[in-house]
Amino acid sequence: VDVFHTAHAQPNDARTPFGKGGLQCESCHGPGGNHAKRVKKGESRPSMIKFGRTADTPVSVQNAMCLGCHEKTAVANWHMGPHDVNSVSCAACHDSHKAKDAVLTRATQPDVCYTCHVAERSQFQKVYAHPVRQGKLACSDCHAPHGTVAQKQLVRATVNDTCYECHAEKRGPMLWEHQ
């Protein structure tokens, strides 16, 4: 199983589900040890927390499980960001059971983002587009998917400041400043 090759399955790291007193899968999926016993007795199984776009577990519950450990890290601005407001689950982008999470890999990240951001895919097919298609740029080079205080989920406070990260020569002074 791939999950045993991920950052979530490190028994020597107390921050991970497998390093927290042996809770393992139940750390994220809730109590499930009695599933088989209850079925044998003719009782219904307690529902398990499931993750992803097609899961029957409410997105708020899915995200609460993830944010229980990750809220203090890269998702400080998650609450009230566009992904939160639009009820996008963490698992819609992240796959914690795979050794290589596609959204964290520069070459595959755009395809994960394009699942929802369909119009952006066509924009990056144009001749004059940034080199996302070629794997030289990822969505997260300019945008902060976990939320930000900047407009358009940018990694810097303004559009210009974000662009200047790569295009310092455009900083000016200019005869007419960019808007």
Tell me what each language-model feature is:
Residues 1-179:
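Short sequence/structural segments immediately N-terminal
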